[in-house]
Amino acid sequence: MKLRVRLQKRTQPLEVPESEPTLGQLRAHLIQDLLPTLGFSSDTRFAITLNNKDALTGDEETLASYGIVSGDLICLVLEDEMPAPNLPSSTDSEHSSLQNNDQPPLAATSSQANIPDEQGSDSSHGQVTQYDAWTDDSMEGPSHSAEAVSIQDAMSVEEASGFHPLEPMLCSETEDGQVPHSLEALYQSAGCSTVSDALIVLVHLLMLESGYIPQGTEAKAASMPEKWKSSGVYKLQYTHPLCEGGSAVLTCVPLGKLIMINATIKVNGGIKNVKSVQLKPGAYVRRAEPGESAAKVYKDLKKLSRLFKDQLVYPLLAFTRQVLNLPDVFGLVVLPLELKLRIFRLLDVHSVLALSAVCHDLLIASNDPLLWRCLYLRDFRDSTIRGPDTDWKELYRKKHIQRKEAQRMRHVMYLPSVHPIPFCPIPVYPRPYLPTTLLPPGIIGGEYDERPILPSVGDPVTSLIPRPGEPPSQFRPVRPRFDPVGPLPGSNSLLPGRASPNNRFPFRPGRGRSADNRLPYL
């Protein structure tokens, strides 16, 4: 709870962490936190008041029992400045007035501080939470200048603390645990016995928020129309100031765990079905005991307000005006051109083109040259100075095509190449190891035997070939068993058909004689 505390024309904010603080806890926080900051010792004796006159007693009493809520102003009066005769009588009368009232009065705002109360002491106790001076006939209050200074001080502290205890006015403004005052009054007056009754009360309030007026009854704003439910079926009739000559009827039928809401209009003696929506009462209404507050019964009011109005209320109003041959009064189409262009500027080009296909009015607005100039400068950052006769839409189209083409070419350029087929006859990549010797390929002992180059690079066989500086592998290097270009094994260039003396395949001698190792006689 956040409070404002004033002592000798100085106001300071004070935060009480307890959920339901008592007067004694407030006094302890004042002694520990506030008095040292104002230059007083912790032994300073003071009285807690709401009007600088009547002291509050009873440390066990909660602040709520005195009608103190978050944001109120608490006035501290030092003991030597407190008039003694006022303490017992005012305290007793204050307790009696609080006990006689069923509900504690709410805190008055700072704008009510200057309003004099001339109805006697009984009425003044009903406004016990008001701060600043009291103009009583039997007691002299502070001067007007002191009142003005105190009001300005309180307003400045309230603005500095950033605390504004405001209740929601519409269902779309609510949070969990909050309901508008109008919904609270409707719920209490309707006497709901089921969750379906509570949901229909909420639907009726949403129709009232949209400008519909109950028809055929003299229902007040804080009560439901007459005969709104009969034999388990709910029926609500409305008129709208923008649809003179037509009326809307909502027929709500419970179907198990759902409620079907059918909207029809009556125009020129005929009835036309417009829209229907299904709602689940359990999603927005809690089961509660009779007499519970509406804040404990309803939930997700913001979601239901958006869903119900977008799917039923606004289409119903637009269709009714269309049947009555009346022009549109709301929506994007009826906005001035300036507002349309400001909205279109926030969209991308695809959304603008989609809106241009809706109707003729939006087509004209979407072809505005100023709009396309803004879109062009936003999307392309072109600093070229162009003449007033520039077709910005056509320029945007050409620039957009160029950008798409450049993106496509960039995508093709950076595409990874396909892995080459193993042993491809035409290598895709250049060979990493080119022979440095001048000998033709295939010579035994050349670089070809040291690092045989296969037709393709990157095939699975090449990865098994050890390179210079690499550790030996368990796979032997792939190399030819004989020279494919040179003579065949066992051949002799001097004596064809005879093996050379140091050949790996010596000539096999005939049976019964040794080999003839003599050189031939030339």
Curated annotation (Swiss-Prot):
Segments of this protein annotated with the region Important for interaction with CDK6: 129-169, 381-522
Keyword Mitochondrion applies: yes
Keywords annotated in UniProt: Cytoplasm, Methylation, Mitochondrion, Nucleus, Ubl conjugation pathway
Coiled coil: none
Pathway the protein takes part in: Protein modification; protein ubiquitination
Motif (RFDP motif): 481-484
Record bears the keyword Mitochondrion: yes
Region of interest called Ubiquitin-like, as start-end residue ranges on this chain: 1-88
InterPro entries: F-box-like_dom_sf (IPR036047), F-box_dom (IPR001810), Fbxo7 (IPR047118), PI31_Prot_N (IPR021625)
Ranges where the F-box domain occurs: 329-375
Entry-linked CDD domains: F-box_FBXO7 (cd22087)
Entry's Gene Ontology BP terms: autophagy of mitochondrion; lymphocyte differentiation; negative regulation of G1/S transition of mitotic cell cycle; negative regulation of lymphocyte differentiation; negative regulation of neuron apoptotic process; negative regulation of oxidative stress-induced neuron intrinsic apoptotic signaling pathway; positive regulation of autophagy of mitochondrion; positive regulation of mitophagy
GO cellular component: classical Lewy body; cytoplasm; cytosol; glial cytoplasmic inclusion; Lewy body core; Lewy body corona; Lewy neurite; mitochondrion
Start-end of Polar residues biased regions: 87-114
Modified residues (Asymmetric dimethylarginine): R518
Segments traversing the membrane: none
Function: Substrate recognition component of a SCF (SKP1-CUL1-F-box protein) E3 ubiquitin-protein ligase complex which mediates the ubiquitination and subsequent proteasomal degradation of target proteins and plays a role in several biological processes such as cell cycle, cell proliferation, or maintenance of chromosome stability. Recognizes and ubiquitinates BIRC2 and the cell cycle regulator DLGAP5. Plays a role downstream of PINK1 in the clearance of damaged mitochondria via selective autophagy (mitophagy) by targeting PRKN to dysfunctional depolarized mitochondria. Promotes MFN1 ubiquitination.
Subunit and interaction comment: Part of the SCF (SKP1-CUL1-F-box) E3 ubiquitin-protein ligase complex SCF(FBXO7) formed of CUL1, SKP1, RBX1 and FBXO7. Interacts via its C-terminal proline-rich region with DLGAP5. Interacts with BIRC2. Interacts with CDK6 and promotes its interaction with D-type cyclin. Interacts (via the N-terminal Ubl domain) with PRKN. Interacts (via N-terminal region) with PINK1. Interacts with PSMF1.
Domain statement: The ubiquitin-like region mediates interaction with PRKN. The proline-rich region is important for protein-protein interactions.
Protein name: F-box only protein 7
Organism per entry: Rattus norvegicus
Taxonomic lineage: Eukaryota, Metazoa, Chordata, Craniata, Vertebrata
